[in-house]
Amino acid sequence: MRTLWIVAVLLLGVEGNLWQFEMLIMKIAKTSGFLFYSSYGCYCGWGGHGRPQDATDRCCFVHDCCYGKVTGCNPKTDSYTYSEENGDVVCGGDDPCKKQICECDRVAATCFRDNKDTYDNKYWFYPAKNCQEESEPC
């Protein structure tokens, strides 16, 4: 059900940030965020609680924490600008809030790329009942 909700949001807000996040994941990690990270572990996908299950899930935990620190705009819907310089994604634009959203997404996409070897199919569609431990602080 959570995946259907994400699909609906992505389709409705194609110009918004969730679509851009998907594009950054594809560009940096060379994989689909929607297919591999939209419902993984305790933190990848909508919401998040408990303890991250592995390094991949921790990427999502850190991303959630990063979004939680953004003030003045909506990380899940606001669009941002970025460019590529020498193969690296560089967040830009005049709005510091939107630039911060871009940085959250860039860091998460890089984390996914750097931790591909920790991805474990047993955490794909991981039951929320297994994420009941107390969450660690950001």
Curated annotation (Swiss-Prot):
Localization annotation: Secreted
Superkingdom, taxonomy of origin: Eukaryota
PROSITE patterns: PA2_ASP (PS00119), PA2_HIS (PS00118)
Keywords, ordered alphabetically: Antibiotic, Antimicrobial, Blood coagulation cascade inhibiting toxin, Calcium, Disulfide bond, Hemostasis impairing toxin, Hydrolase, Hypotensive agent, Lipid degradation, Lipid metabolism, Metal-binding, Platelet aggregation inhibiting toxin, Secreted, Signal, Toxin
Cofactor dependency: Ca(2+)
GO biological process: arachidonate secretion; defense response to bacterium; lipid catabolic process; negative regulation of T cell proliferation; phospholipid metabolic process; regulation of blood pressure
Cofactor note (record): Binds 1 Ca(2+) ion.
UniProt name for this protein: Acidic phospholipase A2 BmooPLA2
Species per Swiss-Prot/TrEMBL record: Bothrops moojeni
Taxonomic lineage from the root: Eukaryota, Metazoa, Chordata, Craniata, Vertebrata
